[in-house]
From Swiss-Prot:
Name this protein carries in UniProt: Serine protease 1
Signal peptide start-end: 1-29
Entry's Gene Ontology BP terms: proteolysis
Species, as recorded: Streptomyces fradiae (Streptomyces roseoflavus)
Active site: H203 (charge relay system), D232 (charge relay system), S313 (charge relay system)
Similarity remark: Belongs to the peptidase S1 family.
Length: 357
């Protein structure tokens, strides 16, 4: 488990086409009607509600949850029959596994203490009941051998995989939100006491106190908070008087309404919206992920198989109408096989006391 009828102008219209990855109708136009919730949206919301209920019931009695690829059911890993009975009572499917939360947490702590190597990433994969470690192409043969030695000492609780590319934050020059001479994307519009903001990646908000919709253009927002490394989120307050919408741009003429926020579940299908690769799809492959970027580690991230590229940093990860995360980085994309990593959005919402809408 993890450690949450006035015409309106959309964010992408405000920032011009293809800027933030969020949006609705152009300024002065009638806002299109909000779509009714789709079955996919309802399914995602129901999944997260069940996952949250199981987490409240079991706490550390579970070694993680995931979505079964064949049945679509929520599977909860447990080590005792008593815990399995609680899972059944909650309406989910239990699966008995060898390692509990304490042993997996200890393996994570050992990696942090003994194998904190730039270019590595690790997180919980409850499908295998292991900590899944990835080492990118920048990790030397000597460091890889050291990593494998540490993994071998942990009684099978850790798997190590070499992956192509290099784990990096995905900032680029080009077309989207601009600050400090760099380009990023934005995740979700949020609100607090009637004031509108947008969330983006902390490594983006570290770069500049003001943000615009075009390179060198007029400022549309000012930084109100930033957190990177350790976390990877930041918040920008709108300085424009335009009323901005809270939907995500699907880059096909359509938009996804966002109604709630939740933590991602391993195995669930997600989408990523960013200003470079637009909308890409994938599944969640690990949670509670540590990524050792070259300029500092981030903790509690989520690893997915969605594709991403430079300039997508700060974009939205979502499932139906549920906001999941803020795009952080990846080790690249081969064909349709990606490694997009996100900062869980609920942590950012809590840190700044804001809500999606």
């Amino acid at each position: 488990m993890r450690r949450t009828t006035r015409a309106r102008t959309g964010l992408s219209a405000l920032l011009l086409a293809a800027s933030l990855g969020l949006g609705a109708a152009p300024a002065g136009a009638d806002a299109p009607q909000r779509p009714a919730p789709t079955p996919a949206s309802d399914s995602a919301a129901a999944l997260h509600a069940l996952d949250a209920a199981v987490e409240r019931t079991l706490g550390d009695d579970s070694a993680g949850t995931y979505v079964d690829a064949g049945t679509g059911e929520l599977v909860v890993t447990v080590t005792t029959e008593a815990a399995a009975a609680k899972v059944r009572a909650a309406g989910a499917t239990p699966r008995r596994v060898q390692r509990g939360a304490a042993e997996l947490d200890a393996a994570m702590a050992a990696l942090e203490a003994r194998a904190k190597i730039p270019g590595t990433s690790w997180g919980l994969d409850p499908r295998t009941n292991r900590i899944a470690v990835e080492a990118d192409s920048s990790v030397s043969a000597r460091d890889l051998a050291r990593l494998r030695k540490v993994a071998a000492s942990l009684d099978g609780a850790v798997s190590v995989t070499r992956v192509p590319g290099v784990f990096q934050r995905e900032v680029a020059g080009g077309d989207a939100i601009y600050g400090g001479g760099s380009r990023c994307s934005a995740a979700f519009n949020v609100t607090k006491n009637g004031v509108r903001y947008f969330l983006t990646a902390g490594h983006c908000t570290n770069l500049s106190s003001t943000w615009s919709s075009t390179s060198g253009g007029t400022s549309i927002g000012v930084r109100e908070g930033t957190s990177f490394p350790t976390n990877d989120y930041g918040i920008v307050r709108y300085t424009t008087t335009t009323n901005v919408d809270g939907r995500v741009n699907l880059y096909n003429g359509g938009y996804q309404d966002i109604a709630s926020a939740a933590d991602a579940v391993v195995g669930q299908a997600i989408k990523k919206s960013g200003s470079t690769t637009k909308v890409t799809s994938g599944t969640v492959s690990a949670v509670n992920v540590t990524v050792n970027y070259s300029d500092g580690p981030v903790y509690g991230m989520v690893r997915t198989t969605a594709c991403s590229a430079g300039g997508d940093s700060g974009g939205a990860h979502f499932a139906g109408s549920v906001a999941l995360g803020i795009h952080s980085g990846s080790s690249g994309c081969t064909g349709t096989n990606g490694s997009a990593i996100h900062q869980p959005v609920r942590e950012a919402l809590s840190a700044y006391g804001v809500n999606v809408y």
